[in-house]
Amino acid sequence: MKVIIVEDEFLAQQELSWLIKEHSQMEIVGTFDDGLDVLKFLQHNRVDAIFLDINIPSLDGVLLAQNISQFAHKPFIVFITAWKEHAVEAFELEAFDYILKPYQESRITGMLQKLEAAWQQQQTSSTTPAATVTRENDTINLVKDERIIVTPINDIYYAEAHEKMTFVYTRRESYVMPMNITEFFSKLPPSHFFRCHRSFCVNLNKIREIEPWFNNTYILRLKDLDFEVPVSRSKVKEFRQLMHL
């Protein structure tokens, strides 16, 4: 797995380089302190991941990531920065992670493990047919407290629309996503998630109990959570077919 580091502070660059070499099998093929130099390099070289600061000369990290997102081959991007206010932009660019300085070594080592696993999965996916069932290690990026949290998709219990935002719930956490529920639902595997209501989608694997409700609708009770998700009248027929009712 080939990676580059984009960081204009020499000591920070050296520290990150050491951590990558010490805790992963990744090959560092370049270190840069200037955004335009990175673009020139990527025109002739393919890498699998980029560790990217935001406050760098010539072209800041966010603009650099926007340019890279247009490439046919899109490397994983991990932002490592002191600027917490760009987390939502990083999410919109589908960054793999967003790490704030100063960081703990454990934060970097955990990210490296997940990144190598995601890259290995990507290599497998490129040579095998696309899976129709959610695998345990399939992940999605969720936003919490201006951080990007890489989350197993099957950890999601349900999502609820709030105006132009979507609240996403796992067993122990909640996340606020900067998108409407239709856009969020499009990122989920349809084999496991169902849009049961205009304001809700639910993980079918997390349903504990189905209770008939008014006007031939249903209320869904979920495993481990004290919450009821409605099924609207317009979705009842499709829901019955999915659940073989």
From Swiss-Prot:
Domain HTH LytTR-type: 140-245
Keyword Cytoplasm: yes
GO CC, one annotated term: cytoplasm
InterPro entries: CheY-like_superfamily, LytR-like, LytTR_DNA-bd_dom, Sig_transdc_resp-reg_receiver
PROSITE patterns, per database record: HTH_LYTTR, RESPONSE_REGULATORY
An MF annotation (GO) of this entry: phosphorelay response regulator activity
SUPFAM superfamilies xref list: CheY-like
Post-translational modification: Phosphorylated by YpdA.
Gene3D superfamilies: 2.20.25.10, 2.40.50.40, 3.40.50.2300
Domain Response regulatory: 2-116
Protein localization: Cytoplasm
Organism superkingdom: Bacteria
Residues with PTM 4-aspartylphosphate: 53
Keywords recorded for this protein, A-Z: Cytoplasm, DNA-binding, Phosphoprotein, Transcription, Transcription regulation, Two-component regulatory system
Job of this protein: Member of the two-component regulatory system YpdA/YpdB. YpdB regulates expression of yhjX by binding to its promoter region.
Protein name: Transcriptional regulatory protein YpdB
